[in-house]
Amino acid sequence: DVQLQESGPGLVKPSQSLSLTCTVTGYSITSDYAWNWIRQFPGNKLEWVGYITYSGSTNYNPSLKSRISITRDTSKNQFFLQFNSVTSEDTATYFCARSWFAYWGQGTLVTVSSAKTTPPSVYPLAP
């Protein structure tokens, strides 16, 4: 079965760079298809970011083209998104997916903030 898994830093400071990894299992990224990055903003709006094809060619959302790069490591069956000069408007859940979007990762939340730490996602209950 084809599986995709995103990983990333969770919290990034404004103006810094964001690097995300998508690890693919069950299918070689050099065999076929385009391997996409998509993001979902708070409020659920989706935006296609870009892709890298099985042959290594890339295509980017024109509105993001100046700030992003998608690369890959075929030996690890991974592909990557580098996002430069991030702002709070880049806060989103980032997904990787195989065309034609039949297989998606679970997504990784990226928050762009000058805060030093992220709040816990699970709060313990008092005994």
What are the residue ranges of the model-derived segments?
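Extracellular domains of the immunoglobulin superfamily
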Residues: 1-127
